[in-house]
């Protein structure tokens, strides 16, 4: 079976060939800055990096640089990383904890709420210093799903409006409770859209990643389309590619996952297509004892992969216990250069939940003894 496509469009969009200019033209790159990067909500980082007062990190989207910080009042704020005196880059270190930001050029200081608080030798400015006008320029910022989102358009839609129905779809995964376990960034010599194009489709998987045939079933994936250019891809997990000959035994790559759930691989000899459903049953049955709360997730979400391609540059990949954030960013002035980021968040077992289940079982046993 080929992948299914679900979705409707108000206006029929004609198919046309995309020219290489969209990937190589400096003029097109400049148009993207105006029409896309300056208008959209973008994943800037993770909320766990700005938990304490004074915590900050820098989000670079060339040529812009944005400070995201937690103020002394515990508010979440974002500002352009630019001293308002002479336009010097204000903060060079990518993350840290500071009560105030000091410009390395003339020593102007800004509180972490953006207010200009100190101007060395201020008396030398004969007309005075208009502090309110020269405080840091704010950028819209919100925290959701354990991520920090920024938008440089002061008049644009809210984050909820930008995400639309996708917001409610992601919330059952409780990603805000997950911990960051991996943070990578690399430089690629290609246009940012080339990377997004690759990760947005599964057409290449059978040819470049043949090992995935024994993990999930790309040919039967379902693609859904949403307003704003977002898409969702649903992929059956804990199964095998339906285009391949069904193996007699469970593939080795699935053994550790089955063992963690107390499932014996020998029990599925000749019936490995039953693994997916049994994984759902086992997780539902033993999840809390293992420290995982699956109550908000559907059965399919316990075994499958859900991928959200968010316009313009983010790919969010969700499983019951893990969350990948993949992001492409333009690099410098070269259309044929970009950054590619990979963040991985994981739901760590909740010891309190495990203890609660243990206590409940102990209580049930005691009650049985009394009876």
Task: Report each predicted region and the residues it spans.
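A broad, structural surface signal
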Residues: 30, 34, 38, 81-84, ...
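Short Pro/Gly-enriched beta-strand edge/turn motifs at strand-loop
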Residues: 38-49, 120-124, 308-312
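Rieske [2Fe-2S] iron-sulfur-binding domain
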Residues: 49-154, 158-168, 172
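C-terminal catalytic domain of Rieske-type non-heme iron oxygenases
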Residues: 75, 81, 142, 147-371
